[in-house]
Amino acid sequence: MNNKILEQLEFNKVKELLLPYLKTEQSQEELLELEPMTEAPKIEKSFNEISDMEQIFVEHHSFGIVSLSSISESLKRLELSADLNIQELLAIKKVLQSSSDMIHFYSDLDNVSFQSLDRLFENLEQFPNLQGSFQAINDGGFLEHFASPELERIRRQLTNSERRVRQILQDMLKEKAELLSENLIASRSGRSVLPVKNTYRNRISGVVHDISSSGSTVYIEPRAVVTLNEEITQLRADERHEEGRILHAFSDLLRPHVATIRNNAWILGHLDLVRAKYLFMSDNKATIPKISNDSTLALINVRHPLLSNPVANDLHFDHDLTAIVITGPNTGGKTIMLKTLGLAQLMGQSGLPVLADKGSKIAVFNNIFADIGDEQSIEQSLSTFSSHMTHIVSILNEADHNSLVLFDELGAGTDPQEGASLAMAILEHLRLSHIKTMATTHYPELKAYGIETNFVENASMEFDAETLSPTYRFMQGVPGRSNAFEIASRLGLAPFIVKQAKQMTDSDSDVNRIIEQLEAQTLETRRRLDHIKEVEQENLKFNRAVKKLYNEFSHERDKELEKIYQEAQEIVDMALNESDTILKKLNDKSQLKPHEIIDAKAQIKKLAPQVDLSKNKVLNKAKKIKAARAPRIGDDIIVTSYGQRGTLTSQLKDGRWEAQVGIIKMTLTHDEFTLVRVQEEQKVKNKQINVVKKADSSGPRARLDLRGKRYEEAMQELDHFIDQALLNNMGQVDIIHGIGTGVIREGVTKYLRRHKHVKHFAYAPQNAGGSGATIVTLG
């Protein structure tokens, strides 16, 4: 499509309306390059993406993308084997993190059915190993100590040396206070110095680094810290060298993945642009138009996007209609209507929402041409008419049946009779070539052309004779008429003069009366349509209100049912606990046999109501939330024992996880790390202990293995285990606690010592575990 139309209709200003919604530099670059497309499938794809984004906002109310810098130049430098600085690496780290977040967001999406965006989400790739390594770069663009063991060693020494220097200088501040101009430690050329009064400069031995502008203060590095400062200088040089080595290593890690990272960055930017299109559509009450396959245009309540308070108008350009001729006086809004049509087409063909109502339809043109405004060329010494005619000739040479042509004041700038004839001839040529055209003119001769010629329609802009001002309402099918007599009368021109003027133009009076009747009919039709739209809007509001009330009622009902169930469950749980206590006491007194106790417990449990929770929305949602908190590859974590951040890279067969923490790879169990994004701790699941029943102490005994348990968890399992053993009349059990630090072993001993049903306990023989296991005799 020709670029001149984009300048004429100020399409770049339209694109700037989307800038406030963008978060990434990549999306800004894509918006800058956005131009109208000429292939319907590509336009349809863009519209489908906006519809998909609308689904996300309807279901989840938001779609967050963090601010991302452009990394295109950094990736080019990587391809040229250059090393990146820390700010460039930080920008890439954010892209990797945002990619991982977006993948997780997509995996958690519910109740959405995408047409186009799914392919974008699924083409995103994550790099858990790279993310883990890049945790060594914090959000402030600083390398953390754990980036490498050498860097950690250097910084530890640096901290110690600086602390010693500060301590020495702090002591000197107290001892030499009368010699100092200020009671502080200053810094000159990276060295710690004291501000000494010039008169006492010989009282403190050391190196002079600076003198104040007044000459009253000398900045001296005391001899006591010279060696330490030299050491600090060397350590800082070592630190810079090690940081450079780490940045080189990080750059080498990225090089094999440049193409994939570039693709991820583009996808994130494109998603950001789609998000901006949706937000623009939502804030401006715009719509996604349908695409016609027969050059039909239907714009309902279309508005000019660059006007602050635009008047909405309907415009219908049917398949058979070749030209619309807007006639009438100037300053009525004819040019605005012409530009509104052009911009609606440019926006639609660029994949942008159109400022119109739902049901609007656009066509797909290979080119849009316009001759709008005074384009007189001073350099070419052309008159207004010559300039317009030169441009029109160019348009007629290039336009074809897949073009849209817009003419403003066609034939103006020359003799009215000749200008009108030229305008009609040009329109007739375009009509015979089946080129859709909209033209504005103030020549009355073109009204007759619009009435008498097939596939050509007149139109005009409404004028309020009461206020003597245009309303900017588009009246399709009604030619424009002159309002000169009405305006002259209202402005005080003598009635006899107006009457005489009317008699002089008597031949046109019948035409004006017909036009006046058409205007009245059009206004009446519009009033009826407006009333129908008002009723329709009221019905929509009522429908939304009913749906809202129903949803609120359903939600409250679910809450009440859940509350009732919980209260009932609490009563049942209380009864079961009481029954356990009673049965335990009976068992202690040997009044019941074990199988009778088990039967009795089964009968009591039958008293609990069996509630089908499979359809409970509240519980199902809770289960989904809980399930979503399970660790996944690519999750950011904090290693509990070290307090360092890392990223999960893979899960081993035994359930343990491999994580990348800085440049170190670690193997962790689930309880040795926490997820960074988890907002609430998961409840610990009740664990069941399988107990082997036995009637006496002979044969295999029940065992409880407490190795690897935390202290509180181990004590809870031990208490439950002993209760089960007593309930099942077991005479002897084994408790395996290991040796380790001895904490759990000591806890087991204390527990058994104070339990009234434990007759005897002792460590197992050496061949059966020794001090790592305890044999307990119950009775």
UniProtKB/Swiss-Prot annotation:
EC numbers on record: 3.1.-.-, 3.6.4.-
Task: State the InterPro entries in the record.
Answer: DNA_mismatch_repair_MutS_C (IPR000432), DNA_mismatch_repair_MutS_core (IPR007696), DNA_mismatch_repair_MutS_sf (IPR036187), MSSS (IPR046893), MutS (IPR045076), MutS2 (IPR005747), P-loop_NTPase (IPR027417), Smr_dom (IPR002625)
Question: Mind listing the GO biological process terms from this record?
Answer: mismatch repair; negative regulation of DNA recombination; rescue of stalled ribosome
tRNA processing as a keyword of this entry, yes or no, is: no
- Domain called Smr: residue spans: 704-779
Q: SMART domains, from UniProt?
A: MUTSac, MUTSd, SMR
Query: Which keywords describe this protein according to UniProt?
Result: ATP-binding, DNA-binding, Endonuclease, Hydrolase, Nuclease, Nucleotide-binding, RNA-binding, rRNA-binding
One GO MF term on file is:
ATP hydrolysis activity
Which cystines does this chain contain? none
Q: Which Gene3D superfamilies match?
A: 3.30.1370.110, P-loop containing nucleotide triphosphate hydrolases (3.40.50.300)
Q: Which residues bind ATP?
A: G328, P329, N330, T331, G332, G333, K334, T335
The top EC class, named as a word, is hydrolase
Assembly description: Homodimer. Binds to stalled ribosomes, contacting rRNA.
Belongs to which family?
Belongs to the DNA mismatch repair MutS family. MutS2 subfamily.
Function according to Swiss-Prot or TrEMBL: Endonuclease that is involved in the suppression of homologous recombination and thus may have a key role in the control of bacterial genetic diversity.
Q: What is this protein called?
A: Endonuclease MutS2
Q: Which organism is it from?
A: Streptococcus pyogenes serotype M18 (strain MGAS8232)
Q: Which gene encodes it?
A: mutS2
